Amino acid sequence: MKQNYILSIILCYLLANVHSAPAIITVWQTVTDAQVAAGPTAAAPAANANANVQQAAAASAPAPAPVASPAAPAPASSAPQSSTPSSSGWLSNLFNSFFGGSDSDSSSGSDTASAAPASTSPQSSSSSSSSSGNSFLSFLSGLFGSGSSSSTPSSISQQQQQQQGSPASGSNSPNSAQPDAAAASNPVPQSNNNQGSGLGSGFGSGFGSGSGSDSDSGSGLPSASSSTIIQQQPSSSNIGSSSTSSSSSSSSSSSSSSSSSGDIYAAISQCDGIDASFASEILDAHNKYRAQHKVGDLSWDVDTYNYAKNNADNYDCSGVLTHTHGKFGENLAAGFKDGASTVAAWVDEPISYSDASFVYNHFTQVIWKGSTKVGCAYKDCRKSNWGLYVVCEYDPYGNVIGQGSKNVFP
């Protein structure tokens, strides 16, 4: 009676834990997964555990189903396999184990548990103490030995093939492709100025920076970023007139339109919309004063004229004189009746020939030896009581700090 009571309790316990059987098989999967993760050194414990299971199964079942060799287990990243062991195999082993008293090795559960690494999936404790002792271990052996589990060698073999055929991690992943290092970049427009060494050393204190990409007149010509200018507006002897001069930031290339034969007027006829009489008059006025200071004549130039004309055409006749800070030397004036009187006003400024006290102004630009070409234009502002607005551009530019004594003579 007592034996039947104990048997009933054990049977109820086992029936209540029938659904734990897949979890026990998951423990075996974890063992084989650990072998994949740890390499050949982890294969020995898994093999020993499997040998113990097969040894215990041999005592209770004459023809156990083969178990896949741990030498080529399923990949560690594979999902747990669904396993539905048949009740005809393990249930008969259950009764045989209770009534037959199999002497299986009690270390199989502990070996299995010790070989299994820490896992994030919950596992049943196969090594816990049980009231059935060795009989319960025989029950475990029956599960592995004679059950017709769906985790067949063929399914494990397919997983082995997938593992062998899969590429190495990250070796062929599109995400590992590096972006093209050659990033397209927009080129910065280059200014076509040729600065001399004198500009870099000059235009120090007392002079404002004249950098800028466009002139106030709307000119689209490029300008250097390191230009410096002289911003002075001395009053002229004529009432209501004012003038200002500028040294631009860069020297321009020689204009092909300038006369190579020495005819300083040749380029006048090549200019569009020009007042030829005004051009000849203002050119002569420049060269008159240059001759007095022992420097060569200026020649009329198409490029400087076009630049000056663009400035003059966009002037608003306000009487405010604003330099364009372009690539040429520049003199401005407003309130005069013609070109000759304009140049006379520029020349009527004080001048010093000493390096220590040299003054850069309109006058020094007019007679600057290094400047060889000029182009001038005007806008009629007499309706606004400002006479003619006159613009003259010089190439190469003058008024370079530190170069005064080499370009301006008594």
Curated annotation (Swiss-Prot):
Per the record, its GO cellular-component terms are: extracellular region; extracellular space
| Start and end residues of each stretch annotated as Disordered | 64-86, 102-132, 148-260
Q: Which UniProt keywords apply?
A: Secreted, Signal
Q: Where in the cell is it found?
A: Secreted
GO biological process terms, alphabetically, are: sexual reproduction
Write the signal peptide boundaries.
1-20
Primary location group: secreted
The stated induction of this gene product is:
Expression is specific to in opaque cells, in presence of lactate, and during hyphal growth. Expression is repressed in response to alpha pheromone.
Q: Compositionally biased, Low complexity: which spans?
A: 148-179, 212-260
Q: Which spans does this entry mark as compositional bias, Gly residues?
A: 197-211
Q: Which residues form the SCP domain?
A: 283-394
Q: In its keyword annotation, does this UniProt entry include ATP-binding?
A: no
Similarity-based family:
Belongs to the CRISP family.
Q: What does this protein do?
A: Secreted protein that acts as a virulence factor during infections.
Protein name in the entry: Secreted protein PRY1
Q: Which organism is it from?
A: Candida albicans (strain SC5314 / ATCC MYA-2876) (Yeast)
Lineage of source species: Eukaryota, Fungi, Dikarya, Ascomycota, Saccharomycotina
